[in-house]
Amino acid sequence: MAFLKKSLFLVLFLGIVSLSICEEEKREGEEEEKQEEENEELSEEELRERRAWLDKLKSLGKVVGKVALGVAQNYLNPQQ
C-alpha cells in the first residue's frame, strides 16, 4: 500500500511539473508571437511613413524643378 501511495505521488508530481513546463513554454511562444506581430505592424507603419515622406520629397522636387526651369527660361530668353 505504501508503495502504491509513493508511486501515485510520484506520478502526480511529475505530471504537475511537466504541465507547468508546458504552460511556461506556451506562454513564451505566445509572447514571441506577439512581439513578431508588433514588429510587423511597426514595419508596416514605417513603410507608410517612408512612402509619405517620399511622396512629399517627390512633390518638392517637382516644384523646385519647375522653378529652376522658369528661372533658366527667363535668363536665356529675357523679355524686354
From Swiss-Prot:
One of its GO terms (cellular component) is extracellular region. It is found in: Secreted. Residues 23-49 form a propeptide. Expressed by the skin glands. The keyword Metal-binding does not apply. Residues 1-22 form the signal peptide. It comes from the Eukaryota. InterPro entries: Frog_antimicrobial_propeptide, FSAP. The keyword Secreted applies. It holds the Pfam family FSAP_sig_propep. Its main location: secreted. Belongs to the frog skin active peptide (FSAP) family. Dermaseptin subfamily. Has antibacterial activity against the Gram-negative bacteria E.coli ATCC 25922 (MIC=5 uM), P.aeruginosa ATCC 27853 (MIC=10 uM) and X.citri (MIC< 2 uM), and the Gram-positive bacterium S.aureus ATCC 29313 (MIC=20 uM). Does not have hemolytic activity against human erythrocytes. This is Raniseptin-1.
